[in-house]
């Protein structure tokens, strides 16, 4: 059993920080010490921001995004193309696509991907909500922006099957050589996907 080196409040802060993805126990200790050293500049404002977020953050009942309003800012933005819907696994994927700034469309967050080995089936994801949105008739194209994993591809095939009875175009993100990527450093699966998705110049 390890010795306690700080009071229970600091230990609790470290334990909670260690639960954040990307932070282990050692990184959590470093982060906690940094916050404590900068108490007025960081710790107090961070505590306030976290309390406010805990009180105000909502899950959008339309798309599954997180925001402080429901429906979210994206769903209520009338400048976005209402007929195109990008389907993503998680909110982090939605945010990544928004940072890219390529398309001004609406989204649908599944909340994960199908994974029978982990016990995650269609009822555990927001697929029913997607089908209902498409059934309304306003959506003309669904872009499946799921990860290029076995589970992601399984999810894409399942969704495509669920939407097959609707008059909607279902597309998916191209897979292959990343911008600035060198062929010698790519794995065989990525190269094979790039060859299959080749385009005419």
UniProtKB/Swiss-Prot annotation:
CDD domains: TOPRIM_recR. Pfam families: RecR_C, RecR_HhH, RecR_ZnF, Toprim_4. NCBIfam families: recR. This is Recombination protein RecR. A zinc finger (C4-type) spans 60-75. The gene is recR. May play a role in DNA repair. It seems to be involved in an RecBC-independent recombinational process of DNA repair. It may act with RecF and RecO. The lineage of its organism: Bacteria, Pseudomonadati, Pseudomonadota, Alphaproteobacteria, Hyphomicrobiales. Keywords: DNA damage, DNA recombination, DNA repair, Metal-binding, Zinc, Zinc-finger.
């Amino acid at each position: 059993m390890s010795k306690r080196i700080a009071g229970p409040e600091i230990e609790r802060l470290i334990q909670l920080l260690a639960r954040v993805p990307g932070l282990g126990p050692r990184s959590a200790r470093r982060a906690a010490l940094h916050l404590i050293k900068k108490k007025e500049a960081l710790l107090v404002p961070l505590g306030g921001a976290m309390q406010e977020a805990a009180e105000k953050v909502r899950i959008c009942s339309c798309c599954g995004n997180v925001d402080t309003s429901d429906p979210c800012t994206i769903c209520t933005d009338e400048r976005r193309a209402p007929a195109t819907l990008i389907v993503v696994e998680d909110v982090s994927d939605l945010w990544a696509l928004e940072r890219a700034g390529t398309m001004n469309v609406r989204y649908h967050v599944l909340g994960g991907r199908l994974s029978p080995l982990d016990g995650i089936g269609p009822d555990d994801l927001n697929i029913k909500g997607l089908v209902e949105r498409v059934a309304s008739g306003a959506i003309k194209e669904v872009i499946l922006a799921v990860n290029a994993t076995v589970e992601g591809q399984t999810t894409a095939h399942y969704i495509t099957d669920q939407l097959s009875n609707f008059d909607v175009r279902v597309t998916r993100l191209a897979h292959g050589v990343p911008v600035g990527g060198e062929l010698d450093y790519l794995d065989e699966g990525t190269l094979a996907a790039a060859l299959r998705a080749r385009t005419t110049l």
